[in-house]
Amino acid sequence: MQITTPYYIIDEKRLLRNLQIMQQIREQSGAKFVLALKCFSTWAVFDLMRQYMDGTTSSSLYEARLGHEKFGGETHAYCVGYSPEDIHALAGFADKIIFNSISQLDTYYNEVQAKHLGLRINPGFSCSHFDLADPARRYSRLGVVDKEALQAQVSRLSGLMFHYNCEND
């Protein structure tokens, strides 16, 4: 048999073992697991994975649409910067929309206030050696730093996102 490259081989037994571990954690803690489509958007195994996961999270409109249409469950959307068109589309199907800044939240709040909304928080440290994704680097604009400004937004939010472990083995 001739296989044309590139191709991906997925060991379903190993994948299933990891999914079963997640299921145990879900049952014992009440935690939810969402698939980060930026890291793994191989829809060939979505039928298996959706049995063990609660939905997807995405970093673009098209990833969010993929998760909504092909995976199901909860659809979480996050992007460093949204266009008005992206927000309008996401308002139609995303369950949770996470903003990178308070100014984004202010700009789009009226259109999405019926959704679960969140803000990305800059923790001020990072475990990553990848400078572009390091929220603690100088002049970083990855998330909200001002604790007082964040406190003023609490009534509009249903959650926070901490993202500090990108590109870390």
Spans of model-derived segments:
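Active-site anion-handling motifs in enzyme catalytic cores
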Residues: R14
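Generic N-terminal amphipathic, Lys/Arg-enriched alpha-helix
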Residues: M1-I9
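Short, flexible coil/linker segments at or flanking structured domains
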Residues: I3, I21, I25, F93, ...
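Active-site-proximal beta-alpha core segment in soluble small-molecule metabolic enzymes
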Residues: K32-D169
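A short, N-terminal amphipathic alpha-helix
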Residues: N18-Q28, L66
